Amino acid sequence: MISRGLLSKGILSIIKRKNTGNLIPHVYYSEYHADIEERRKALGRLGISLYPSVTSDASTTTIPVIIEKWRNKITKSEIAMVRYTVCGRISSIRYSGSKLAFFDVLYGNKKLQVVFNKKNIGTEEEMKGKFIPRLKALQKGDCIQCSGNVGRSGSGELSIYATELPKLLSPCLHPIPVKLTNYEKRFEKRFVDMMSNTKSLELLEKRYRIIESIRKFFSERGFLEVETPILSHHFGGATARPFITSDIHKLPLTLRCAPELWLKQLVIGGMNRVFELGKNFRNEGIDATHNPEFTSCEAYCAYLNLEGMKKLTEELIRFICLTINGNLQISGQTVDLEKGFEVIEFIPALQKELNVELSPLDNSENCRKQLISIFKRCEIMLPKTCTVAHLLDKLFDSLVLKYNTSSPKFVINHPEVMSPLAKSDIKLYGAVEQRISKRFELYIGGYEICNAYEEENDPVAQYHKFQAQKYDRLQLGDDETPAPDSDFVHALEYGLPPTAGWGMGVDRLVMLMTGQSKISEILPFGSLRYV
């Protein structure tokens, strides 16, 4: 008997619901999936094997390769004496009398017509009682193998003219919806959504071409792709709430929120240009643009300043757009990447919207009270935790970014209190000296795409910035602020060269490049609520 542990959760839930917990699999299928059992038997009666291996020549040429190779060759009604064996999934079946059938076969999202003409497949005697029954035993969704000569139909459609009956490779035992539109059902069975809606498949393929282009861009510029810990005692330097677990010895562990501190330690060790594409985890809410598990790319370059990183960022965004879309126009957006990206300075832009000159923006209680009073005056809802950093972030989002969503723009010179891992500077705005960070954020089409720093490499300065964060964590209850990382400060004591660091949310970039407004659409299995 097969153990219950080998059965899928879906099957087990059905068995439990129907009080059939003692049924073994073949009984389950015969009683509750009679249609599946009947089709398997019907195929067997015709001598059709259900799950055979493919022949050795089946994978040599795929449908996309044939389409590309013969795109501009062969005239209407011409058949070339070039034979191919192709595999794919049936997307539609049409008959013309009892001697002619047309199958549309999909390989990914590329479709090729296969024409079955009785006279080309065998003699009348050989095909007697076989041709139509064998074809009609197949249905939409089945995976098949076909062999024949390439040609073009009378209507001009590129086709394979079969010289033998199709070989069933794997039957589809459930009906494929013509068009699956229910949002919840699409993500409950994402594979069915991909089979029913070619757009879903195309979006996911585009996602991975974007990721591939990011890798290519950095590799061509001398960056080495690396891996850093995902599960550790530190969650990585980002301002976020981590997922916490423990090991077998009950020692606390977290899933990383960002790889930043690990990557900078690699730079200290001598790896001067590194990048990492990988998963991060933040124990936060789910909405149209946020998922607790997400993909990011972070890159660090020794002996590069912030201006150099801005230039590199513009080059990357244009490179990806050209690679994916073939031009510098972003899908579904009136965004033109040909022009230079606009630059907005954080404090002047905020002061302009408020029509006030802000006093020094620091971690003091006076500054916090000043900002809270501005929130009340502007009738903006306060953030959950009213640290100076959170207050400034929400105020800027609400007053400045809300009305600047079209053209690409760099936001620069954030207040120091918002960027504890960035180098600092002092700048005069009117009559007020403000401590600012050497940082930029890139916004395109309303999305925050990138965040970059000239990295703080003074261990004493970094220690004091961590201590200021500690106040927010302990006194103001900000559980998104990481605890001071003494190991990282110790690493800085060995000398981090002047370094520009950069992070990009890959999921949001994919949303931008594909014109999607919901993050679930560009994730293979949707957001966390569906997995």
Swiss-Prot record:
Coiled coil region boundaries: none
Top-level taxon of origin: Eukaryota
Keyword Metal-binding: yes
Keyword tRNA processing recorded: no
Subcellular localization(s) per the UniProt record: Mitochondrion
Record-level GO cellular component terms: cytoplasm; mitochondrial matrix; mitochondrion
Entry's Gene Ontology molecular function annotations: ATP binding; lysine-tRNA ligase activity; metal ion binding; tRNA binding
Descriptive protein name: Lysine--tRNA ligase, mitochondrial
Species name: Schizosaccharomyces pombe (strain 972 / ATCC 24843) (Fission yeast)
Organism phylogeny: Eukaryota, Fungi, Dikarya, Ascomycota, Taphrinomycotina
Gene assigned in the entry: msk1
